[in-house]
Amino acid sequence: MLFHFFLRCNLASLCIKIVNSVVVVGLYYGLLTTFSIGPSYFFLLRAQVMEEGTEKKVSATTGFITGQLIMFISIYYAPLHRALARPHTITVLALPYLFVYFIFYTDKRFMHPRKNAMLNTTTSMRNFSIQCVFLNNLIFQLFNHFILPSSMVARLVNIYMFRCNNKMLFVTSSFVGWLIGHILFWKWLGLVLVWIRQNRSIRIRPNKYIPFYKLIRLDKYLVSKWGDRIFYILVILIWFYLGGKIPAPLLSMKFDESTIQLEKGAKGKKKKRGKGEEEGDVEKEDEVGVGEKKGEIDESEEIRVNGELFKSLVAHFFVFDPNHFATLLFDPNRWNRPFRYIKNDRFDNAFRTEMSQYFFDTCPSAGKERISFTYPPSLSTFWEMIERRISLPTLDKFSSNELSNHWVYTNEQKSNNLKNEFVNRIEALDKESVSLNRLETTSRLCNDNTTKEYLPEPYDPFLNGPYRRTIKKTKSLSPEKTSGDNLETSRDNLETSRDNLETSRDNLETSRDNLETSRDNLIDKIGINRIHSILLPDIPDTDYQKLEDQFDKKQLSIEIVDLFTFAFISEFGKKKGPKSESNLISRDLLISRDLSVFSDEKEVRIEDGKGVIIDDEKGKKYFEYLENRIGTNTDDENIDKDSIAKIRKKVSRWIYNATSELDQAYGEDERKDPMDNEIRSRDAKRVIVVPKEKLERDDDDDEEEPTDIDKIIFPEHGDFRRDVIWGSIRAQRRKIVIWRTLQRYTHSPLFLDSLKDFRHYFVDFLLDILNIFEPIWRIIRNLRIFLIKLIRKRFALKILEHREEQQTHREEKKKRKKDEKNEKNAKNAEDPEREPRLWVSEFWTIIEYAQEVRGCVLLTHSFIRRNIVIPLLIIVKNIGRMLLFQRPELYEDFEDWQRESHVKCTYEGIPLSETDFPEDWLVEGIQIKILYPFRLKPWHVPGSDSDQNRKKAEEKGDFCFLTVYGTETNLPFGYSRLPPPTFESFFKPIFQELKKQMRNSKKNIWKLGKMLFQKVKGTKFLRKVAKKWVRKSIILGKKIIEGLKKIKELVKKERDPITSNQMIPESFTQISSPSSTNSEKKRNKMQDLTNRANKARNEIERIRKEKKKKKRSLKKTSSNAKRLQRIKDRLIRKLPVYLKLFIQRIYTGIFFSIINIRRMSQKFRNKFIPDQERKDILPFIYTINKIKESLYTNNSEENSHIFYDLSYLSQAYVFYKLSEIQLSNLDKFKSVLQYQGIPFFLRSEIKDSFKTQGIVHSKRLPSSEMNQWKNWLRGHSQYDLSKTRWSILIPQRWRNRVHRMVKRKNFNKRNLYEKYEKDQFIDSKKENICEVSNRNQKDDNFQKCCKYDLLSYKSIHSENKKDSRSLFDKLSFNSNTAFFDLLVDRARGMPIDINNLTGTGDIPYTEKTPDRKYLDWKMIHFDFIRNQLDIENWITIDVNRKDNRNQKTPIYTNNYLTNDHDTNFEIIYKIDKKTKKPILDLDFLRIPEKNPSNSSKGFLDWMGLNETQTHPVVLNKFNRLKMEANLFPEIVLFYNAYKTQPWLLSSKLLLLNLNNNENEINADNEKNEKKEAKKEAKKEAKKEAKKEEKQNIKKELTTKGDLENKGDLESVPSKEKNPSKDSKEKKDIQKDSAESTTKKVTSKELQKELDAFLQRYSGYLVKWNRRVDPDIVPKSEINWEVYSYLYRLFDDENPRNRKEIDPTHLVLSSAKRGELAFEILATRPIQSWKKLLLKRKELVFFEPIRLFGKNNGQFIMYQTIGISLVHNNKHEIQPRFRKKKKRYGSKTNFDESIPPHERITRNDERIPTNDEDEKRNKRLRINYERNADKNHLDLLVPENIFSFRRRRKLRILNCLNSKNRNDVDRNPVFCNEKNSSQDLDREKNLLMKLKFFLWPNYRLEDLACMNRYWFDTNNGSRFSMLRIRLYPRLKIR
């Protein structure tokens, strides 16, 4: 038994020894390293799987094992360990090799077999590919193992090797263990693969991958190709991963460091202080030069900017040290900076936290040499210097035994000393010594042992007691006088800087600099360490010998201390000046107090200006030694500053001051670069809070304005990046388990056992798990609280001790929570979505790059919503409406769509604009606010889209914000609106309408039933029959129900087998036996068996019957089934044909229904029109058509004058012809022809080829504008009409000659301005053609086309920049007359039909008015009142003409009255001598002749303003009214006057008072006012009474009238006055007006009647039929009584009047008497009136005209004329006058701009009354005559009227659209030679060119025509200056 026991003990011990042996441990760690998989396994796996042949596999395995063996050997062998076992060396080796490998194997040139044929040899070992496989596996095995799990397992071998003694055996065993593990791993992998191949179930399951697998097996090349690609991708990923482990030195941000160069003034020697070493200390030294008496600083600092470029670039990116090249790439600071930064608010730089004042070094400790961490670097450097410079025997290295012996000896000596001291103290106490100081015996510094003189107690370094104190920093003594002066000045500077420290920071910095310079000087003179000169390398040996001879080595330290003490005393005891007594006192005190070192025999004498004189011999020796050795030798520079810097070690600081983002944002950082911050601040947002007082404060308050509060808001979540330095490397904690955004105590689970208290880790983990189940939070809430309490009770520390404190703390917490809850509840009551919104906003800020992604998604959703989704919804909705035969609402929907605007907002929702983005929106975030979001409506109610509803919607704040999902929300980050508003707005009205219809249908059904019941109820027979049928039906229904119930019961009984097979029960009395109980049991069993058998039998029979039925059905098919099968087959065969036909049928049906929608809608409209109105409309339309047909026939029969000019074409036809023109890109041809390299003969050939091809019709190429219009027109389908439609628009003979220009030989533009006798346009054979026919020749009037537009002329005449004179081809003149077409725009050649002037044209077209020369009046709404004030304010006449003709010309102002100021119209008629009837006189178009001598007028005189024209005869008022009513009756007078004679308008009225002095005008006005003061005094009394009457009349008229307008009647008066009239001319005017009128009515009464009549009834335009006898036209005055009587007669309210009196007779009789003018008469919609006029003779017909609102007439008129007034040089200016009118604006006033409040007018005068007309006209005349001689009137510039924003856009558009006018096309049609004439437009005045370029004048009628065409409207509601093409006024060459 004992033997067995010992055996077991030996076995156990043996096992323990074996386990603890090096071999087993090595095998264990080797097995662990097999699980550390690195990138080399990829190469080995590739060789085993993909490579063919055993050679490559063997080479791969061999290389893999060899590499691992080298790694194990590197653990033991130091050189290999340094080369391979360091991470940075492995990284440096791995990255280049991986890159080369990737390039080499991906290039096909290297991998091609033919290319590698030279490298491959016969033997396998010499094969290059096999060698590459071996090297790859060998080298990649040396890399870091990072795949599974990490490199930690592989490094465990290195760690354990330090613990074992037999290292070689450990390495060998670990390698064997790794090899065994590697072999086992590959064998296991092979077995797994074999098992997968053999296991059929695993291979069969993925059936869907079988085809892919077969394809791979068939195509072996595909396998190798994709396998290589995958492998190369893995290689490049490994390369990136390894490269990501190290920071990039070239891309990291580096702090700015500047090298400073200091220059000395004395010797010119330079001393550089560059970048510091690893500690990074950089000091700027300012040295004070020697030899300056006044203490001036001679040194100058320079920043080295002009250094070498290469060195500066290298210094910017690298910290290069040639001695330490490894630190270049592997800096412990990770290239540039640490991880964190501790700020320092002082001036000094911050501390370096990762550096310590201690480091590792060897030192003797406890008798042995050990590594000590608490070893200061200054001591080590000092000791190294001593070892280098002093070869003492004590510095030899001792053995370990010697060190230990010395240590033991010193310790014994110390213990003995302590024992002795303790014994001495006890003995002193026993002796009862009085002196208690014996207990505190200390060693003191003694000067001499014999005298025993000690240093003072405060300065004794060995004294430890109450007298010990720190010595202040002092400055050493300089033996030279100059150095002493410098020290004195530096000390004075220091004192002054200390005094000014509190006042300014700059003084403090300068004082600190002075202190540093003085300190550096002391270092240079003496040195820091007191034995510094001994340790310097440049000290010769003779100095040491002298030192040994003169001094005793034992007292060296004491003597040096005395010397420094003396130097300190002498320095601070110096005298500044001879009269400073305070300095003497302080000096004496210092000497008496501090010079106790020396004996009484020593004499120290300090003389003024001579420094310190020492009489003692020892003192002299000290001084001489210091002067020779320790003093600074400026010639030799014996002091090594680098060694001093090493010795003077301080606390390590950063060489820079890093600033954070917040400091830089708030201006604390003085650097200018906004991106030059080094520290990451916490995520914050700056919010400016505006106080309510500032918003509610008025601007007029004098109180101080409250300032805005600048507040920084931090998110509630944590930010781990705060206070981290930019570019620093973070700690890669790959083993930390992170499961939440903010996690406390982040540690790896592997180190939980090392934590003191790791219970909180599990607590957090449990809490997080519980938080995951938020949906079931209510269920487990109690359980969670219980667990938390249990954990706290079990693991909390010191609960019992601090229970009371915790209780109070809990109460406080409860109160806080209650307060927080109350606050949250209050906030949630205001905004319930506040907390979720805050959470979502913070969530977007937490995630990295979330704001960038969110911003891009929002912009994408905004674009899709705006441009894709909404237009698609609109189109789908309108298509549905069209399919339902309803009118489409595209216009209304797109109008609502245009109102929606997307505004960019900040992250908080503050809107900015639609185009501007917030600053840093990609980083800080963005919101998109949708204003007036689009809501799709099923139909538009007419009143819903009114302005009032829109204003209500604006007041409600109809807006929303866009979410990431594309939905709408009320607030940023709020909940989405559900249901979507677009669908709700669309379907909700539909459902409501359906509900209404359903209700109505129910009501209708109920009513119908009720009606039927009432009808049936009326007959007794039917009532009886109905009762019988009801009774019978009820009885029959009951019987049917009862029968069904019986059938169900029978069926249930038959189905139940138990009830169906029941036996007949027998009585127990009949059967009786003793064993009755047994027999009953047997009977029951038998019954059950029989029941089961019967049930089984029945089931078998049922199944057999069903099978038979199925067989029969399969064999025999009925005829119906066969027929159905045949039909089905036939349908399947013909299905495609049916589908095609069905689709075509649907298509045609839809197409025709769409076409017929308009026709059907017209039918629907006609249904609602009463029959009576329809009958009345038809004859009216019939008469109009008949009149038109007669006109066409008359024109065709009688050779009417048809002008072949382009101006007579309609706009639609022009665009049609443009679309037919062959499109060709002529811009390239222009560039070809303009290229100078092409020979001249080739250019002509190219041009000829263009002509033959029909590309061009002229020698010059057309401009590209036509091509642009053609492209635009071809994209619009509304001009793609059929030929029949185009043939209706224009006669065929017009179209045949459109492409051809009118050929005219010897045409010259100059002839227009020369004598009229030489006019070449006159054709002698056709002189009489030009005469306009009289009233008998009305049917010969010209053909009129009123649908053309100026836009068409722009398109056609883009090539024709010259004037078109085709109108002159059909007109001729007398030799003494000159015809000038006023309505031709010479700049573009756009003549207008003369029918517009004569008023004898066709019926006016009211939808699109014919183009007029200067203005489109439909876009301006004038008031309808024709007051004399309004019209005379608008038009004034200058009659002061010296060149009046012999005829007496009556000139009138625009007025309806017959007073002195009669009306002047442009339509002037002569009385024919033969017929004595009025005919048209064209002399009014004659250009007036002017005298050159009288040409000194203002700027606008050249335009033809302010002059009168001579007219022979003016027709009577009725004829004029009739002629003018054909155009626009509401503004006919003014419009006609302006259209033909724009010079009738006063220039002063247009330009107002631009540059005149108001004082001069007022002075002249006063003179005139004095003369008329007497007249005005008489009229003042009458005026007041008349004003009240007028106001009452106007109120009555406005309330009763059909047109109630709210426009302002205020006009813009001006101080410019019209010129005065001569008295003779007044008399002529009065005579002519008396002759032209047959009736006279007083002006006041007639004015009132006219106003009332026009305001009441002017709603229709009345016209006469041309075929009516002209004798009916009255020539007398209007009888207003007849008008009123007719209106009363035809009123519906008085039917008796119509029956009693025949209205036809009354109308005809009044018209013949001249008492009725149909042109002014406007009828009310009365059927009888229409019947009267259209029943028989068709005398007149009515046309509705547009009713205009009452706007500010004068103001709009002034704007219109001011913009649209074209310079009339072609009307008035002759070539001979141009030389004298070179300047149109003065240079002095060129830069003068009109202020905004004076753009339109500078005067705010009240509107004068009718009685003030005469006075006002006189003022205007006087002012005009004064200003007529001045030549400094400024140009009329549209920018003066526009706002500043519109000015800028106007200039931009002008510059973009302006073209070079040099390449104007020339055509032989107009001229055969170059035209050398220079118009006024081409005046070579640089000032005018500049003005016309900056402020081009644009024509308002062009804009109006564009408006009419683009928007198909007649009003000016959509008129916009931004959507138009602006035309320049002048052609600047």
UniProtKB/Swiss-Prot annotation:
Keyword Protein transport among record annotations: yes
One Pfam family of this chain: Ycf1
Annotated compartments: Plastid, Chloroplast inner membrane
Sections of the chain in a coiled coil: none
Coarse class of the protein's main subcellular location: plastid
Region described as Disordered: 266-291, 473-514, 808-832, 1066-1121, 1562-1642
Topology of the protein relative to the lipid bilayer: Multi-pass membrane protein
Compositional bias annotation for Basic residues: 1105-1115
Any one GO biological process: protein transport
Protein keywords: Chloroplast, Membrane, Plastid, Plastid inner membrane, Protein transport, Transmembrane, Transmembrane helix, Transport
GO cellular component, one term: chloroplast inner membrane
Statement: the UniProt record of this protein carries the keyword rRNA-binding: no
Membrane-spanning segments: 18-38, 60-80, 87-107, 128-148, 176-196, 230-250, 1135-1155
Composition-biased stretches (Acidic residues): 278-289
InterPro entries (alphabetical): TIC214
Bias kind Polar residues: ranges: 476-487, 1066-1078
Biased composition (Basic and acidic residues): 488-514, 819-832, 1564-1642
Similarity annotation: Belongs to the TIC214 family.
The protein's assembly and partners: Part of the Tic complex.
Function of the molecule: Involved in protein precursor import into chloroplasts. May be part of an intermediate translocation complex acting as a protein-conducting channel at the inner envelope.
Name recorded for this polypeptide: Protein TIC 214
Organism: Jasminum nudiflorum (Winter jasmine)
Underlying gene: TIC214
